[in-house]
Amino acid sequence: MKKNKPSPLFYYGTLILSLLSCNAAALETDAEQPITIDSNTATYDDLTATSTYIGNVVSIQGSIVVHSDKLVVFFVDGDAEKLVFTGNKAKFKQTPNVGAKDITGESFIGHYFPKANQLVLIDTATIWKDDGIYASDLIEYNTKTSLVNAGEKTTDTKRVHVILKPKSKDKSINKSTNQ
């Protein structure tokens, strides 16, 4: 009895699917990834348990990338509890899922809480997500769920500005209506 060997296409397809599933798992677990930081200068203060990075700072955790002028990391029991980044403007991006558009944002000040998956943008903050633009003096962004909360609930004087762009129409729909 002759056994059928799987075709090379089968092996190729299996390889592609396994690579895509590994990539998706990495994006869902950004908070479990180490934080890497590159900068022009770095100092660590053992008394305050903080490290300060200045000059063209790039910090990366999984698919989250932040570019800033200055970054201060606050440690609790040796773990990075809070990262405060500042810049003119500091910028971030995250790839939420494989094949999805990157979510990007900017502000003058940002606070990132890795354990809580929370990014808070302060002072002229903007987030570009899907086809929408969110602008406010305060925006909270959950890096795990991609949920955006803009504005302050305690004040009526500060407004949130949102632009929702319409999705482009499918070309096949246009063809059927023109015939």
Task: Tell where the protein language model's regions lie, with residue ranges.
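Mature-chain termini and adjacent capping regions
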Residues: M1-Q179
